[in-house]
Amino acid sequence: MNKVNFQSEGETLVGNLFLPTSNIQDEKLPAVVVGGSWITVKEQMANLYAERLAEQGFAALAFDFRGYGESSGEPRQYESAKNKTQDFKNALTFLQSQPMVDPDRIGGLAICASAGYMARAVAGDGRFKSFVTIAGWFQHPDTTPESYGGAEGVRRRVDLANAAMNKFRSSGQMDYVPAYDPNNENAAMFFEVDYYADPKRGAIPQWENQFAVASWSEWLQLNGIDGVAEKITVPVLFIHSDNSALPDNVRRFHRLVKGSKDLYWSSEGTQTDYYDQEPYVGKAAQIAAVHFRNTLA
């Protein structure tokens, strides 16, 4: 694994570039940009999948989005679909500049919320040649209120977000709540999620259990399906399960994609099982590698 950095709209993003150990000298590699769940850092699920893809012969880049982990950017822990979409595009630009990478054979793999962000990048940037989502979370106005206390819960959080952003712009100070706290209804994740509670899983030292309140505005008003799925023309593979997040939204996105598409559906595994648990990660990574091998040839 090589520690790398690159620029994204004036910010320095820090990443881990995983390479195959058996690469033939001077052979140009297919490459994959990898993104994890919302409010996470590269050392969580992104690193894990990038390492697995490298074992399968790909150059794979996991990185911290602006405002997260080792990357620069303010406010910290600010969840922005717009920013993350652009960061994915700039990660691809970085991979294209690497001498061991074939600049015309680069795809994207996204876990959870990154699926919606990366989909926007893939739809708007023809340099992405293939796309895989794993336990993808595709936000849509029809379903968002179900997770946040209905329309009133959404409005309340958006109002808080707008006030927090106005405060940040005038004072440079951001309001924060916990990213995860099942005992705090104001937390970003106010329900039980073992992954973020367990130091052996997601509650690692590199991860800040913090959420910029201003994030609610973009997150809760995001439509990650309509006007996005229809624009994707590269081969897409959706890996999902009955017990992963928003299964009907994944099916909806899949239906709207007009190009080559595949859906691998399992009756086993929860959303967070696909973050770091076996056999789910191993199986998903293997299926993704086959897809990339066939579509980045």
Q: At which residue positions do the language-model features occur?
A:
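N-terminal cap/lid segment of alpha/beta-hydrolase-fold proteins
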Residues: 1-27
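Short beta-strand element of the alpha/beta-hydrolase
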Residues: 27-37
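The serine-hydrolase catalytic nucleophile loop
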Residues: 38-51, 65
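Catalytic nucleophile-loop/oxyanion-hole region of alpha/beta-hydrolase
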Residues: 42, 68-103, 278-283
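Conserved alpha/beta-hydrolase
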Residues: 52-72
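Alpha/beta-hydrolase-fold enzymes
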Residues: 119-199
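Short beta-strand/loop motif that positions the catalytic acidic residue
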Residues: 231-232, 238-240
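Catalytic active-site module of serine/aspartate enzymes centered on a nucleophile-bearing elbow/loop
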Residues: 267-269, 273-297
